[in-house]
């Protein structure tokens, strides 16, 4: 088939093609229009987004401006009352107002400042930082004022504690710090710290203030009872306790009463964990004070004479009391202080054991060091007896002798020494050994001095009588047997006889083979006259010399002078009276006043004057 269908309709095809081209053009135009519209729509959409952002930004800026205005308003309020608060802080230091009033005022001001600080802390305003710094400074100043007021209040409690120092060492009554209303006060400040100050990084520092004042108070109480100042009048029970005791003993027992009181008060004011943490901080200064003093005294005790260390025997008792108090009164354990006490006990035991040995070997059994005196007894003699008395008195010290062993105090032990069946026997042997050896040492030392002569009897008699009296009036008597007391009595009699020899020598001048005859000797030969003159002369010289020495330097122990005066009168006066009666009317001299210096009554008074200083 030639051509095709379009060959037959060529005109129609052309028309169709034209129409198709026209439609295509219309479609292209429509597409362009649509593209243009799309572009315009895209532009409108972008403009709408910008507009939406602008609206959002506007709203945000408006909100920020509003918030800023509010912050500025708050800042203005804070600025307006800061001067008022500052003035209030100054008034809180007004001494004319009560401490409680000032305390309430400063707490109110601090609460207001803390609120201001919290407000400023979240402020977005850059210039608010300066205001915050100002508030910080005022908070710091207010906390210092609060701390000072707390210090004053706690000092009041400390002062009332010092008023109780008089009963601290009266072991018959319990002792505690006066803390009425203290718990309420401390609780108030602690709650204020937690609610107001801690959130703004501030504090009243109440715990450290309490630690400082309580620590100082404990030290002051120690000084008060150990120094026994006029400001502190100890009651009778405390006076009885401190009498005759060293500072170490007093301080240890005082601490054993103070430390439990501190611990108990801490548990009243704080929880147990806090109380145990604060306790060592409070008591450390006092314990250090006692520790340092004790260490220094240990060196003194080691160098001191053995007899002087008798006071340490009471320390053994005090250490026992200290341990008992710490075990019975402490609400929680203080192992450190108990360790210190036990250490002191061990050290003092060593010193005492050494002193027990040195008292015998270095003092009693040493004739080179014993003092020789006719003025009653020496300080050394007093010291020996005080040591022996304390040793017998303190039952807690008896184990010291037991640790030494029977006769263990001697450098050399003889086979014939008496055995011991008990600590009491050891104590008895030690006491008697010390007294016997001391008397022997004094006698040996006196015999080596030519000028002592009859005065040796005075020395030994004074010591012997003193020993005997002290044994009988003390607990030593419970350790001794009858044979021991008889031995002391025999020694006193022996030394009395030794002393009386000088008076017998005086009275020897009055002996006369004819004195027993009743008649007076009216006429005498020349030889008899000279003998009689010599007798009167010797008697006068001797008795005057003896009486003069007695007046100047002889002093007898209580009771000895009365006894000896009677013995002397019985020895001298009868012979003199007979001699006087026999020759008063004789012709042995024309100048009787020269030879007969004493009437019978005068001689009695003259001899009495020798003993008067001791009566």
UniProtKB/Swiss-Prot annotation:
Keywords: Exocytosis, Phosphoprotein, Protein transport, Transport. GO terms for cellular component: cell division site; cell tip; cytosol; exocyst; nucleus. One of its GO terms (biological process) is exocytosis. It holds the Pfam family Exo70_C. The keyword Transport applies. SUPFAM superfamilies: Cullin repeat-like. InterPro entries: Cullin_repeat-like_dom_sf (IPR016159), Exo70 (IPR004140), Exo70_C (IPR046364). The modification Phosphoserine is found at residues 2, 418. It comes from the Eukaryota. One of its GO terms (molecular function) is phosphatidylinositol-4,5-bisphosphate binding. Gene3D superfamilies: Exocyst complex component Exo70. Belongs to the EXO70 family. The exocyst complex is composed of sec3, sec5, sec6, sec8, sec10, sec15, exo70 and exo84. Required for exocytosis. This is Exocyst complex component exo70.
């Amino acid at each position: 088939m030639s051509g095709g269908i379009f060959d037959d309709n060529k005109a129609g095809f052309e028309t169709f093609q034209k129409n198709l081209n026209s439609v295509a053009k219309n479609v292209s135009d429509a597409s362009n229009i649509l593209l243009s519209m799309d572009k315009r729509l895209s532009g409108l959409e972008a403009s709408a987004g910008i507009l939406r952002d602008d609206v959002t930004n506007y709203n945000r800026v408006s909100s920020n401006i509003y918030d800023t205005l509010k912050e500025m308003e708050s800042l203005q309020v804070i600025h307006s009352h800061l001067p008022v608060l500052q003035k209030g802080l100054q008034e809180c230091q007004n001494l004319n107002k009560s401490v409680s009033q000032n305390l309430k005022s400063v707490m109110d001001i601090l609460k207001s400042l803390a609120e201001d600080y919290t407000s400023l802390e979240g402020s977005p305003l850059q210039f608010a930082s300066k205001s915050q710094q100002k508030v910080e400074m005022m908070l710091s100043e207010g906390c210092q004022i609060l701390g000072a007021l707390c210090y004053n209040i706690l000092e009041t409690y400390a002062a009332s504690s010092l008023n109780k120092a008089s009963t601290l060492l009266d072991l018959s009554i319990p002792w505690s710090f006066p803390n009425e209303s203290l718990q309420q006060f401390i609780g108030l400040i602690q709650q204020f710290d937690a609610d107001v100050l801690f959130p703004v990084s501030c504090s009243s520092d109440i715990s450290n203030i309490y630690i400082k004042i309580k620590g100082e108070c404990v030290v002051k109480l120690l000084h008060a009872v150990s120094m026994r100042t006029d400001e502190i009048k100890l009651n009778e029970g405390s006076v009885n306790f401190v009498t005759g005791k060293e500072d170490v003993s007093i301080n240890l027992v005082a601490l054993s009463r103070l430390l439990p009181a501190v611990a108990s008060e801490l548990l009243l004011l704080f929880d147990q964990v806090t109380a145990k943490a604060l306790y060592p901080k409070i008591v450390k200064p006092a314990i250090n004070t006692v520790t340092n003093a004790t260490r220094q005294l240990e060196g003194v005790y080691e160098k001191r004479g053995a007899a002087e260390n008798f006071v340490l025997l009471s320390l053994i008792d005090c250490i026992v009391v200290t341990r008992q108090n710490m075990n019975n009164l402490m609400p929680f354990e203080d192992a450190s202080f108990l360790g210190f006490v036990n250490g002191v006990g061990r050290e003092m035991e060593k010193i005492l054991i050494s002193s027990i040995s040195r008292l015998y070997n270095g003092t009693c059994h040493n004739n080179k060091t014993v003092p020789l005196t006719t003025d009653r007894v020496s300080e050394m003699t007093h010291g020996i007896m005080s040591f022996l008395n304390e040793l017998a008195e303190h039952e807690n010290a008896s184990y010291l002798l037991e640790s030494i062993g029977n006769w263990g105090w001697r450098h050399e032990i003889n086979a014939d020494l008496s055995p011991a069946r008990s600590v009491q026997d050891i104590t008895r042997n030690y006491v008697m050994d010390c007294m016997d050896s001391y008397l022997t040492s004094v006698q040996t030392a006196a015999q080596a001095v030519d000028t002592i002569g009859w005065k040796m009897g005075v020395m030994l008699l004074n010591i012997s009588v003193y020993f005997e009296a002290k044994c009988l009036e003390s607990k030593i008597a419970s350790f001794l047997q009858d044979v021991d007391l008889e031995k002391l009595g025999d020694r006193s009699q022996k030394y009395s006889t030794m002393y009386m020899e000088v008076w017998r020598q005086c009275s020897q001048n009055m002996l006369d083979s004819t004195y027993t005859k009743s008649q007076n000797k009216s006429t005498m030969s020349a030889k008899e006259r000279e003998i009689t003159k010599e007798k009167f002369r010797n008697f006068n010289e001797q008795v005057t010399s003896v009486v003069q020495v007695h007046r100047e330097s002889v002093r007898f122990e209580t009771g000895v002078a009365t006894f000896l005066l009677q013995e002397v009168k019985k020895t001298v006066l009868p012979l003199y009276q007979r001699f006087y009666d026999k020759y008063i009317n004789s012709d042995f001299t024309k100048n009787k006043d020269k030879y007969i210096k004493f009437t019978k009554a005068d001689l009695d008074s003259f001899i009495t004057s020798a003993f008067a200083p001791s009566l």
